[in-house]
């Protein structure tokens, strides 16, 4: 199934918000093979929040569910890394072009995801990294996921 077929499976409300173009790095079949659940939360996460993200991500992998997150520091990084370490699959939905790791300390993780899992962006190479990209990324993440688990978030969070 290609992205055009995937688009046809969306509801009218979902189609309204689906990005015009998506860029892929990695195994596109992850969008179609299994169930997908987003695990998201604060960049300034607590120890307890990180532990919850780890437990939930391990549990999702155990049930053959793909872990989706946004590659931000904190909860997102823990979700991706735990899925990989647990032998599962992960999808990173980026708020930057595929060639721009954000945060920079996730450069190695992004490369691993692009090689062995899937990274998705709706932003072409050369597109500037701007704060407004990240809520757009969050909407795309929700559109490709069957469910979203919010681990922890502040009142000003883009996760809300």
Sequence positions of predicted segments:
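Active-site oxyanion-binding pockets that recognize sulfate/phosphate
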Residues: 65
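Short, positively charged patches
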Residues: 1-54, 58-62
């Amino acid at each position: 199934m290609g992205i055009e077929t995937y688009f046809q499976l969306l509801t009218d409300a979902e189609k309204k918000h689906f990005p015009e173009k998506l860029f892929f790095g990695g195994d596109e079949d992850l969008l179609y093979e299994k169930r997908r659940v987003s695990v998201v939360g604060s960049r300034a996460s607590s120890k307890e929040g990180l532990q919850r993200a780890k437990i939930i991500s391990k549990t999702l992998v155990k049930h053959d569910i793909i872990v989706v997150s946004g590659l931000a520091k904190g909860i997102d990084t823990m979700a991706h890394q735990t899925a990989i370490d647990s032998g599962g699959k992960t999808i990173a939905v980026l708020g930057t072009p595929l060639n721009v790791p954000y945060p920079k300390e996730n450069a190695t993780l992004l490369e691993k995801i692009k090689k062995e899992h899937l990274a998705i962006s709706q932003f072409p190479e050369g597109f500037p990294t701007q704060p407004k990209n990240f809520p757009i990324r969050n909407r795309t993440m929700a559109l490709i996921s069957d469910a979203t688990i919010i681990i922890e978030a502040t009142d000003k969070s883009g996760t809300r």
